[in-house]
């Protein structure tokens, strides 16, 4: 409850840490077990802690307490009925998941961070079952594929290459949907990423294993499917509840620009399945044409 949350806000601990860290020249504050080795090694080697290490530990304390305060204000904001859509001061916090081998290009360093709030249905919640570590471009492209998948409440398979949809299939089964997605562009799908909101079974896995794919994401892989797909050493298999169509509460699109940050609402307007479109020509589309248009409308929104 709200009252329990308020009761659990720690006042003394952060105050003690901040006071000690302020006096870092004379006090060593170690809040992260990962730093124990560094401190012990210095003590063993010199009998003291260097000023360089003290200042590093000082920074770690204020980083930690700042994150703690940010999480409190985010919770309090989530409890407001009249919270401003775009607050005057925007404070966000993320936790590092992993450092990448490189970024978008080999000469760029990069890391992946996760939101500390609700991440259900998003990449940070995925469980990697097989394959190499995800790269910067892998994560970026897979996220784009998952955003397109959210448009569908029926069984669908999305194939993405270099951030762009190259195949989409909608059918009664994942196997049929994959066949349609593959046939949309058999050339571009090679080396691409495939995501689905249905279970990958043996029949689907057999089809998928015939070509080189970077990543496959699904809410579930059968044991038979895993036995087939894990024969490919470098293929990444991610298990994620892709049936979740709603974005986490309060999710916003943030885009860094030099000297600032652009923030906007998620574009989660889904085209109605009943085709709520006004035809302004004398020629009326057939039911099949309208069905195709509805599918194309969803896809083109995610084309770059």
Annotate each language-model stretch with its function.
Residues 68-70, 78-303:
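ATP-dependent carboxylate/acyl-activation modules
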Residues 1-80, 172-173, 198, 255:
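Active-site loop-to-helix "anion-binding N-cap" substructures in soluble metabolic enzymes
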């Amino acid at each position: 409850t709200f009252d329990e949350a308020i009761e659990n806000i720690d006042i003394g601990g952060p105050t003690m840490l901040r006071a000690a860290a302020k006096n870092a020249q004379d006090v060593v504050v170690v809040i992260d077990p990962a730093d124990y080795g560094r401190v012990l090694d210095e003590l063993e080697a010199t009998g003291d802690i260097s000023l360089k290490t003290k200042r590093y530990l000082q920074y770690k304390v204020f980083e930690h307490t700042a994150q703690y305060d940010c999480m409190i204000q985010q919770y309090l904001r989530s409890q407001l009925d009249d919270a401003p859509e775009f607050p005057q001061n925007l404070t966000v916090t993320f936790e590092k998941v992993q450092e990448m081998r490189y970024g978008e290009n080999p000469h760029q360093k990069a890391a992946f961070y996760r939101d500390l709030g609700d991440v259900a249905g998003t990449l940070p919640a995925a469980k990697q079952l097989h394959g190499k570590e995800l790269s910067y471009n892998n994560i970026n492209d897979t996220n784009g594929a998952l955003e397109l998948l959210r448009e569908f409440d029926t069984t669908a398979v999305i194939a993405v290459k270099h951030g762009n949809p190259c195949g989409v299939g909608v059918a009664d089964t994942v196997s049929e949907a994959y066949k349609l997605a593959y046939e949309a562009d058999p050339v571009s799908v090679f080396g691409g990423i495939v995501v689905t909101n249905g279970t990958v079974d043996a029949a689907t896995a057999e089809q998928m294993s015939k070509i080189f794919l970077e990543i496959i994401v699904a809410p579930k892989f059968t044991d038979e499917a895993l036995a087939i797909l894990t024969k490919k050493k470098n293929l990444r298999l991610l298990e994620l509840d892709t049936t979740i169509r709603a974005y986490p509460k309060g999710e916003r699109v943030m885009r860094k620009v030099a000297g600032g940050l652009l923030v906007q609402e998620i574009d989660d307007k889904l085209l109605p399945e009943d085709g709520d479109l006004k035809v302004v020509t004398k020629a009326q589309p057939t039911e099949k044409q309208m069905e195709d248009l509805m599918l194309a409308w969803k896809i083109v929104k995610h084309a770059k």
